[in-house]
């Protein structure tokens, strides 16, 4: 829908307060009356845009394991999937706007978490449970491990991107950082005897 696309582009670039319904109508090439026919207020349009963005950003399936999977390769593939989702521009923009507008729209942080990070935590937890099932890893608490892995992968690169800061030149490249995270997680949960 053109109105939603226009609202998303404007809100994510400028924030809630700096965008008017007139701007949204112009960008969507519709009349202001058409915008109000679909969304009775800027607040409702904003909330709908955030809900939509939260849901669309976290689609996708994580790699699946089998009994003979190369766990290090699968762990790398899985953490790369997580990293790409967490550090891509749109999820970072949505996160920024939720942090800025959360006090004004208290339902948005819960919706964001429930439609964004929580499904990712569940998918990663399922991955660790599969790894346990096939004895590829020994993860005592898959849910906790999933949350810790997400924060590890997001880490210093994510916070710098969130703040629109450059990553220092002496910081490891993203791929090297990811390899380090894979090795750290593997060593933490390597089954006895491996």
Q: Which ranges hold each PLM region?
A:
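Solvent-exposed, non-membrane alpha-helical residues enriched in polar/charged side chains
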Residues: 1, 8, 12, 36, ...
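Helix-turn-helix
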Residues: 2, 6-44, 48-49
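Amphipathic alpha-helical segments that line or abut small-molecule/effector binding pockets
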Residues: 5, 72-88, 92-103, 143, ...
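Short loop-to-helix capping motifs
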Residues: 41, 104-106
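Amphipathic alpha-helical linker/stalk segments
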Residues: 49-78, 84-86, 90, 94, ...
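C-terminal peripheral helix-coil segments that are non-catalytic and often amphipathic
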Residues: 77, 81, 118, 122, ...
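Amphipathic alpha-helical packing segments from all-alpha helical-bundle domains
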Residues: 84, 88, 93, 97, ...
């Amino acid at each position: 829908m053109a109105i939603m696309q226009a609202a998303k582009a404007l809100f994510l670039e400028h924030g809630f307060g700096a965008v008017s319904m007139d701007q949204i109508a112009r960008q969507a090439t519709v009349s202001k009356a058409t915008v109000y026919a679909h969304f009775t207020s800027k607040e409702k349009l904003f909330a709908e845009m955030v809900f939509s963005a939260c849901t669309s950003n976290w689609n996708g399936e994580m790699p699946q394991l089998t009994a003979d999977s190369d766990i290090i390769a699968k762990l790398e593939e899985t953490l790369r999937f997580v990293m790409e989702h967490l550090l891509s521009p749109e999820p970072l923009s949505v996160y920024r706007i939720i942090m800025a507008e959360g006090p004004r729209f208290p339902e948005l942080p819960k919706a964001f978490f429930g439609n964004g990070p929580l499904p990712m935590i569940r998918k990663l937890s399922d991955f660790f449970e599969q790894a346990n099932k096939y004895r590829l890893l020994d993860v005592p608490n898959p849910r906790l491990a999933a949350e810790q892995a997400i924060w590890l992968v997001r880490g210093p690169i994510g916070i710098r991107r969130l703040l629109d800061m450059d990553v220092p030149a002496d910081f490891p490249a993203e791929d090297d950082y990811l390899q380090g995270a894979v090795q750290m997680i593997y060593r933490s949960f390597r089954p006895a005897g491996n």
